[in-house]
A protein has these predicted regions:
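Conserved catalytic cores of very large enzyme subunits
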Residues: 91-497, 518, 522-683, 687-688
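Long insertion/accessory domains within large nucleic-acid-processing enzymes
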Residues: 679-716
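Amphipathic, well-packed alpha-helical segments that form the structural scaffold of globular domains
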Residues: 24, 47, 454, 458, ...
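Charged, amphipathic alpha-helical regulatory modules used
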Residues: 1-109, 710-715
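Contiguous, well-ordered alpha-helical segments that form the cores/surfaces of helical PPI scaffolds
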Residues: 229, 501-514, 534, 691
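Short, solvent-exposed positions on alpha-helices
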Residues: 37, 57-60, 499, 523, ...
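Short, conserved micro-motifs enriched in small and acidic residues
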Residues: 13-14, 498-502
Length: 716
């Protein structure tokens, strides 16, 4: 009887069906090519060869036979997929795979990890510790948790399994903190009970403590859905407390009858000072805190209140102070005010603040000044957002991940206290390369990739569904997400659409160029791009019905992925003009960064894609220094309100510590950041703030993202 010698030297009976099954797996993989009957034909031929050989074959010899026969039968795609599968399996059998990666972090030679996140300073030991833990965690996940076909697809650049360095722990991606409940009903931090704050200053301090705790228990961004509205009652509390103190001073210190008019005037002035101090506390705390993730908390402050709100006056004061503090900036080590990366600010445009005759237009004017100087705030149009989200206006989680509308048992929409389980992204340009100009072939391959993405996303859900609340008390027991008991499972919060789980995508522009020969802004290109978006939406809708999970379509930020996908495809397919030669792929549905288009046409074009990318989207315009032309900024802001749900403006805000230059630091021919005055290229002596992909980065970027930033053209 024929026998096969396994890797450990043991022998098992020869089974040609196992050979055929392995070949079929490679054919049906993300990078293989199925040919009916081929697997069985090759298995039969190998069995015939082994019979003639009249001796046992090693597993290695069989694998070599499979590879060469696939080449012989003109199926190199499956041959490569088979080799990739073998490599992944070999990797999983290894016991120690992280030494080189960890040492590379310590000696700063592991560039791919060091530059992966532009808000993590890898020179700092606390950040290094997080990155080292990430490499070890990623290694365990690759060898023990992630199925081989998903891992092979990830390694080949067919898909990207985001945040692989966190999945061995029961953590989710991003959320909307239920801050209002935590401040109103109290919370617990590190086992210490925190009661309802009695003043605005204390509320601000508690808020930053909550933000830090939440950031350490998840790996993505967090947002406060209406920071002005939520903190406004505490301004009133401070005012009333201060007013009583002023009256007491009038009577007891100055021996006078209470003068209520004067007392109110003094109390309001002191309250404004407390609001200023409180907002300053939030801004400085967020930018100086270091979480267990090795970076400042990635937090978004969403500014939105309605004019008939009981505390509208106080909410407006908070919004005003947030904007004034951001315009001022924070000091760097050279004692110069610079643009802070966090918190991200979002300002909602609505009827009460968008026209010159509206009561809160002065806040919009202040927001325009802030944008011109500090890039934030970004803008959401209440009018356009309501069209896409069943009449609701709410914050994205982090920079762009949006929840789907969801109603509680009473039929009320709920957004605060909800979250996203994670992301898997598709490489749309790679499909275009493989399709070789055929639209039919493109969608055939896309459907196969979607099957893989579905499986990968379900893995994320399955890793969380049996988790108990004890893993992160701030989230699950003390109000950020829920108020469960110790030991209670979180599973019910994952299903029914309460939480979202995201199918990401990158490179609509490149995919369209490969299939239609034109940009996604062209007539044919736009039609094809929309077909892709429709197919992706069809998939998530099908999965939602099938699994009862809140799948969403998400325009991937792709901070490092833009470089990773492009580099993998260039290595595999060579240099392809306008595709792999750039060093990056274009984010999500965006217009190519090099394409000449004005801000109004760009927003108008991309607004149609936002309607289809409701699980995550944002559009931007590159503008010059407009601090002396605020009316033009206001004109563009008005256009956002009328035409697009969510948009932002990118300006330049840099500083050279060598010569004191304050202006735009550019990328030179060597892809290095260089001061135009003294030509300093030492990254340790440059502060460069750029929009990375929805938020600001300040610790530099990988090679691909740097090239993308360099290529950006102005839209005005």
């Amino acid at each position: 009887m024929l026998q096969v010698i396994k890797r450990d030297g043991t022998k098992v009976p020869f089974d040609k069906n196992k050979i055929a099954l392995a070949i079929e797996k490679a054919e049906h993989s993300s990078t293989g090519l199925y040919e009916e009957g081929l697997a069985q034909r090759i298995a039969d031929e190998i069995e015939e060869y082994a019979t003639k050989l009249q001796k046992d074959m090693t597993i290695y010899a069989i694998e070599d036979q499979v590879y060469y026969k696939l080449i012989e039968y003109h199926n190199p795609a499956t041959a490569r997929a088979y080799e990739g599968y073998k490599a992944v399996q070999a990797f999983k059998r290894r016991q120690n795979t992280t030494d080189d990666d960890v040492i590379g972090l310590l000696d700063r030679s592991n560039v791919s990890v060091l530059d992966e996140n532009s808000n993590k300073d890898a020179a700092i030991v606390s950040t290094q510790r997080d990155l080292i833990a990430g490499e070890v965690s990623k290694d365990i996940a690759r060898r023990k948790l992630i199925p081989t076909d998903i891992l092979e697809a990830h390694d080949s650049g067919a898909i990207h399994f985001h945040d692989m360095d966190y999945i061995i722990q029961p953590m989710f991606n991003c959320c909307l903190i239920n801050l209002e409940d935590m401040l109103t009903n109290g919370t617990v931090i590190n086992g210490k009970k925190i009661d309802t704050p009695k003043s605005f200053q204390v509320a601000c301090t508690v808020t930053t403590q909550i933000i830090a705790q939440v950031a350490s228990g998840q790996y993505g961004g967090q947002s406060i859905n209406g920071i002005d509205r939520i903190l406004a009652p505490f301004v009133r509390k401070s005012y009333e407390k201060i007013l009583n103190n002023v009256i007491e001073e009038q009577v007891e210190t100055y021996g006078m009858e209470p003068n209520m008019e004067k007392a109110r005037e003094i109390a309001w002035k002191r309250t404004r000072k407390e609001v200023k101090d409180g907002i300053q506390t939030i801004q400085y705390q967020i930018n100086t805190l270091m979480t267990t993730n090795g970076q400042s908390p990635f937090v978004t402050l969403f500014m939105y209140f309605k004019p008939d709100y009981e505390y509208a006056k106080e909410a407006a004061l908070i919004t005003e102070e947030i904007l004034r503090q951001r315009i001022k900036g924070v000091k760097n080590e050279a004692d110069v005010y610079i643009t802070p990366a966090f918190p991200k600010l979002i300002y909602v445009l609505d009827e009460h603040n968008v026209t010159p005759d509206s009561p809160y237009y002065y806040l919009t004017e202040l927001a325009a000044q802030c944008t011109a100087k500090r890039m934030y705030p970004d803008y959401i149009s209440a009018k356009k957002m309501k069209e896409n989200y069943e009449g609701n206006v709410f914050s994205p989680m982090g920079c762009r991940s949006f929840l789907s509308p969801w109603k509680d048992e009473k039929g009320n929409y709920k957004f605060d206290g909800r979250f996203n389980m994670g992301v898997v992204s598709l490489n749309l340009p790679q499909i275009g390369i493989l399709a070789r100009g055929s639209e039919e072939k493109y969608f055939e391959i896309l459907d196969k990739r979607l099957e893989l993405a579905e499986k990968a996303l379900l893995l994320r859900y399955n890793l969380l569904k049996d988790v108990v609340s004890d893993v992160s008390p701030i989230h699950w027991q003390h109000g950020a997400i829920a108020r469960l008991k110790k030991g209670e499972k979180i599973g019910r919060f994952l299903t029914g659409g309460y939480a979202t789980i995201s199918l990401g995508y990158i490179g609509i522009y490149e995919a369209t160029r490969l299939i239609t020969g034109e940009s996604n802004t062209g007539e044919k290109g736009r039609v094809f791009a929309m077909k892709i978006m429709d197919r992706l939406n069809d998939a998530i809708n099908l999965w939602h019905d099938k699994h009862n999970l809140g799948f969403g379509l998400y325009g991937t930020p792709a901070e490092s992925l833009t470089n990773r996908f492009s580099s993998l495809d260039r290595a595999r397919f060579g240099v392809i003009e306008d595709i792999t030669d750039k060093g990056y792929y274009t984010n999500s549905y965006h217009v190519n960064v090099r394409e000449e288009i004005n801000v109004f046409d760009k927003f108008n074009f991309e607004s149609e894609f936002q309607k289809k990318s409701t699980g995550g989207c944002i559009s931007y315009a590159e503008i010059p220094n407009m601090t002396n032309n605020i009316p033009a900024v206001l004109t563009m802001i008005q256009y956002i309100y009328d035409h697009i749900s969510y948009a932002e403006f990118n300006t330049k805000s840099d500083y050279c510590h060598e010569c004191g230059f304050d202006g735009e630091i550019k990328v030179n021919e060597n892809n290095e950041w260089e001061c135009p005055r003294c030509h300093n290229t030492n990254r340790d002596k440059l502060t460069v703030i750029r929009r990375t992909c929805g938020y600001l980065g300040e610790n530099f970027w990988n090679e691909g993202r740097t090239k993308e930033i360099k290529d950006r053209v102005m839209h005005i």
